[in-house]
C-alpha cells in the first residue's frame, strides 16, 4: 500500500505558529475525541506514522506533525536545535489548534521530547508513550556504536546532494533487517525529496548538530536527557527487541525511575520504527494503554 493510500481519511495541512512558523500536520479523527499527538525522530517527518494516523483516528483526534527544521515544516536557521525547542513547538501547536490536553507519543527524539514536554508543561498532558525513546542512558558498547553509526550515515545526506542509496542506508538503520522489505521506493524517494530541498540542506547542520556532538564523544551520550523522576503522568516505555542505541535492558533500567511507568516490548521483531514495522500490534497497544492505562 502506498503512503497516500495509507493517508486516505487524514487531512494534510499547514498551520502557523508564533515562534516556529509554518508547521505541516496530518490530522484524523473527530475533534471532540481525546487528542493524541505523534512525534517523529531526528531527521524524520510525518510519513513515519503513515500507517497509524487513520486507524488511531478511529479512537482519538490524532495529530502528527513535522518538527521545525524537519519534513515540510519551516526551516529556521536563526535558532539552535536543542530538544527543548520541539517541546515548545508542541505547546504552541496545541495552543493554535485549541487543544488544552492531549496524550503524547513520540518515537526516538520524539520520545525524548515527550518526556521534556511532560516535565515543562504537565498540565497539558494525559498519558505518555515513550516509543524507542532517546534521552535515557546508553548502557552497552553496541549502543554507543549504534549512535556513532547513525551520525555517520546521517552525515552522508547533507553538505552534498543526498542520493537514493545514502537515504536508503540511513533508513535501513531504523528498521530491523528482517523488515527491510518495508522500505519501499516511495518511502525512500519521499525522504530523498525532502532532504534534497535547499532549505533542508541549509538547516541540516543545525538540526543534526546533536548527532555530530555524540559522534565526537564516541557515542557515550546525547545532549539532553529526560528527567524521568519528574514525570508525574502515567508513561509507557514501548520498546523492541532490536532497538538500536537503547536495547531492552536500557529500557528496563529506566522503568523504575518513572513514578507511574510500564514497559511493553513488541512481540514482533522490530527495530527503531515499531509503528511502521508492525502497525497493527503498535496501534492495538497504543489504544489499550491510552484508554485503560494497561498493556
Predicted regions and their residues:
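Catalytic active-site module of serine/aspartate enzymes centered on a nucleophile-bearing elbow/loop
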Residues: 260-295
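Active-site loop/oxyanion-hole signature of alpha/beta-hydrolase fold enzymes
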Residues: 26, 64-109, 113, 120, ...
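Conserved alpha/beta-hydrolase catalytic His-Asp/Glu region
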Residues: 161-227
